[in-house]
Amino acid sequence: MTPEETQKAATLIWEKWDADELLDELPEDCRPQTELEAHAIQSVFPRVSGQPQAGWKIAATSKAGQQHIKVDGPLAGVILKGRILENGAECSLNANAMGVIEAEFAFRFGELVPPRERVYTAEEVLSRVSELCLTVEIPDTRFKALGGKLQLLAECACAWWLVKSEPVTMNWRDLDFKSHQVTVAKNGEKVAEGSGANVLEDPREALSWLVNDVGSRGVSIGAGELVTTGTCVVPVPVSPGDEILADFGVLGQVETRFN
């Protein structure tokens, strides 16, 4: 794709987001044919939206998530600063085509993680992390029929709203993330339960996957960027009026409600 075609695709997707409208698919002259082209479209979103990049998300780190968006593996997506909300925020479901929430662990980097030829281990990645946060993600798509892997990548892997907690204050570095239980209650009733094992076996492994995936394209993870690692529970359907509480046990809770 030419830079002009990349810009056209990103602009079209963003305009549809802004207008609460859906697409059948991207026009043929700006439809990505490779993952590299799809990620190039992502990289333009901060410019076309006027919002700086705040971090990354990982979609489809669990089998349930992969089945939900019809892909066979995880996807990395850019998160824009204007899409991150504080704990307790009210979210709009207006024109949301997916209508689900996900409960996730998120890690903020305290220093730059540059690309390199040798892959980063989970331990090396975690040593560069300064904070753990808890999140509820509200993903969405602008494609009427979940437009296939490449188009989903092009729209930042379904990144939309992300409600996050304050940084966890307890010592979390020795936590067994894999077995740590997470529950979700909707309108006061528990509706989902899972654990970190649903996130590529361990959220820390998912985090290192993201770092190495991004680095393979010559992209750094910036100091201060937040990475939300994928859902610990089966995606929970939500409707306007619902109140959600994601409970991460001793680590804390995240709440949001929908209008």
Language model: regions and residue ranges:
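A conserved acidic, glycine/proline-rich C-terminal tail/linker
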Residues: 207-235
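Catalytic-core "active-site belt" of small-molecule-metabolizing enzymes
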Residues: 2-202, 239, 243, 251-259
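Carbohydrate-binding surfaces in secreted/extracellular proteins
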Residues: 246
